Structure formats: structure tokens, C-alpha cells
């Protein structure tokens, strides 16, 4: 990820963003600033309330009382101003990967934003202790506090896996058996843009949650055709796209900002086949695959290593210190949570 990202109105890319985005420093680091009133389905990428309360309430919808209690807590936190949050280094995708130069600029940009947005909470998403130790020390010096966010899974293929798990072997064999066409596109036609957008909506929005980023056609057009990302597409014998994954590369790391597959197409193991193609691409590139969160059991059975990811938050300036105490309390309350705790709960 670098300065090649175009300057756009965020809503033109993410219709439920409820935020504006600016670019700071010599490394063009993105900073998203929430706007209020927020969209009722504000994406979790830009809204702490959506990430920690609304999304959880959605997942607990089969338990109405639990969902209502979680939503009530979210309302209380919103009264304390959490909807007004500026996120530093926050690309409009689920997992932001920074260069070393960008990480060096984060503390100074944080100080700048604290001055320019004194009534906002300041946050940094996607912090991993095993990858961001120096940055964590710098943020602690600025009194940022760590709040557990989610469990992400890494596949370190920079020197290859020593052993291929049995589930992964079966996925790779299935991909080979089906004799599908696989293309890693650096440009998309209008027809392809419409198709991948449709597949994304089927999985992320219709199957899972409207709190996921509601990407527009313009997003898929610009991130691929302006070569910010590539698009791995799997086609059938009729040359119809049956699944896809956006590939975002930063140094040695690959992330998957969006994917989708046709849930109505009669393809054996659609998600397994797509993962096998993603894995093969990452292995051939000798990359570190950050495969984000979700489907934890699936990823662990294929060699994914779980890590607890954090969001670091700094309270805004205020007269009575209530927001500072809230953040300190939340950090202390959650400090004993580890990755296995969340895995037991389905992460």
C-alpha cells in the first residue's frame, strides 16, 4: 500500500463509511475521521461502536435478550462520544498493512490529529504485538490503550510450510481436479467489475452482515484498474466468474480485502477452492498471507496461525476525565483476554 491510492470521497467507495479520509505525512498515511450522525449500518472499519457492539449484537441475533443488552451498551458508549473517532493508518479495507516508513510516521501523525481533532477519540487498528512492538511502545508513551479487537490468521509462506495439513492437501487436489481457469487480473472490464461486486455482496452483505464495508462498483474499478490491487478470478468452462479475491500486496505481506463466490453455482467446495487458489498464489509469491478474521476452524485446519489483533485508542481532551477513565477501564478489563479465549468463543 502506498501513495498510489487515489484521492476520492470515501462514500464513493464505501457507501456506509460515515467517515471522511485524508492523507498525511511524507508516506501518505490515510486518516479516517468519523462524521455524525453516522449511517445506521456504519462499517466496522470506521466505527468502533459497529466493530465492538453492533457486529456482536448481529452475531447474537438468535439470542434477542443478549443482542438488546449489547446494543444498549453500545448506546451508552455512543453518548460518551465513541462515534467521533479518527483512525490513523486506516485504509478503507479490513486489514491495513504499513511499510516501515509509515509506521515511523504514525506517532507524529497521531500527535497532529490529537491537536486538529481535540474532541475525537484517536485510534489505530490492526495492531499485532509480534509485528508492531516498537510502535506499541511509542503509542503507550502517548497514553494510547490496547483494546482486543479480533483474532486474525497468518500463513507464513516466505520459506514454505514444512508440512502441508491434510485439509489443505484435499483443497489443493480439489482445485486441480475441477480444471477451472484461474487468472490474477491487473485490469477488469465493466462486466467483470459488475460480477465481482455481485459476488462480494452475496457473501459479505447478504450472507454475513450489512456492517461490513458496502463497497461500490467504483471501488472495485479503481483499486484494480489503477493497480492498487490485483483480482484473482476463478472461472468455469463457460468463462463465467464463479469466485474472486482481491489481492493487496505490501512488501512481503499479502492481504485479502474482499472475496466472493457464487453460492448458487454447483461447484464442489466453493470456498475451499477459492482458498486453495489464494494459498497457491501466496506460496508462489513466497509471501506472508494475512488472512484476516473469521472462519477460524477452517483456517486452523489448513495451517493458519492465530494472533490477537488490537485497536489502540486515545481519549479526547475533556474537563472531567470521564472518557479517559472509560478507556483505561476498558483496557484493564480486557487485558487478560488472550487468543485462546476468543477461539473458544468461535473466533
Go through the PLM ranges and name each one.
Residues 142-162, 288-347:
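Active-site/acyl-donor-binding loops of N-acyltransferases
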Residues 66-181:
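Acyl-donor-binding surface of acyltransferase catalytic domains
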Residues 56, 60, 109-117, 139, ...:
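Hydrophobic, Leu/Ile/Phe/Ala-enriched alpha-helical segments that form helix-helix packing faces
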Residues 15-114, 241-264, 310:
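Conserved donor-binding loop and adjoining core beta-sheet/short helix segment
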Residues 219-324:
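Aromatic (often tryptophan-rich) hydrophobic motifs at membrane interfaces
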